[in-house]
C-alpha cells in the first residue's frame, strides 16, 4: 500500500492502452494521430498548468512524432468522471493520457470501485515538496 500511496502522491501521468495498437511495429509505440490528455483538475490550476507544460515539452522535443496533444479538463465528481472514462476506454486507449495527482486519491478510494490498478503508470512527472512561506510583512522571521 505504501508503494501505491507514494506513486499517487506524486503527480503522475497514467494511461490505459496496454498494447494492441496497429502503430506498434517493434514493441515501441509511435503516435500517428492526436493524443488526448485528460486532466481531472480545474483549468488554470497546478495540475492543469503542469499537464500543459509537459505536453508542450513533449511536442517541442519531438517525443510525440509531430502529433498534437489536446488537453481536456473533466472535473465532474471530483474528477472521477474523467478517471473512469480513461480506465474503461476501449477504443483509442493508446492515445489517451491522464494526469493523476494526490488530490485524486481519497475521493477515488472512498467513493468508487475505481482503483490505481485500472491504470498503468507511464511516468512520475514530479514529486511535490511541501514548503511553508510567510509574507514579507509578517512580524516573525521563523516559527
Q: Which functions belong to the PLM regions below?
A:
Residues 7, 20, 77-80, 111-112, ...:
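A generic structural micro-environment signature
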Residues 14, 91, 137:
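Residue-level marker of positions within ordered structural domains that often coincide
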Residues 3, 7, 16, 107-108, ...:
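Generic detector of low-complexity/intrinsically disordered segments
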Residues 17, 84, 108-113, 122-125, ...:
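Surface-exposed loop/turn and secondary-structure junction residues enriched for glycine/proline
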Residues 9, 97-98, 122, 132:
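Well-ordered beta-strand positions enriched in small/hydrophobic/aromatic, beta-favoring residues
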Residues 22-118:
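N-terminal (or domain-start) structured segment
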Residues 1-34:
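Short, low-complexity disordered leader/linker segments with a strong preference
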Residues 120-143:
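A conserved helix-loop-strand patch within extracytoplasmic ligand-binding domains
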Amino acid at each position: 500500500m505504501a508503494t501505491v500511496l507514494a506513486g499517487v502522491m506524486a503527480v503522475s501521468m497514467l494511461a490505459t492502452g496496454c498494447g494492441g495498437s496497429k502503430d506498434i511495429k517493434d514493441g515501441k509505440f509511435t503516435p500517428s494521430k492526436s493524443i488526448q490528455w485528460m486532466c481531472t483538475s480545474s483549468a488554470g490550476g497546478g495540475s492543469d498548468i503542469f499537464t500543459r507544460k509537459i505536453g508542450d515539452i513533449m511536442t517541442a522535443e519531438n517525443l510525440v512524432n509531430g502529433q498534437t496533444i489536446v488537453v481536456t479538463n473533466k472535473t465532474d465528481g471530483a474528477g472521477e468522471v474523467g478517471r473512469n472514462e480513461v480506465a474503461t476506454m476501449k477504443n483509442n486507449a493508446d492515445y489517451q493520457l491522464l494526469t493523476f495527482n494526490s488530490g485524486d486519491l481519497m475521493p477515488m478510494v472512498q467513493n468508487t470501485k475505481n482503483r490505481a490498478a485500472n491504470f498503468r503508470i507511464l511516468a512520475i512527472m514530479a514529486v511535490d515538496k511541501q514548503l511553508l512561506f510567510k509574507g514579507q510583512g509578517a512580524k516573525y522571521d521563523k516559527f
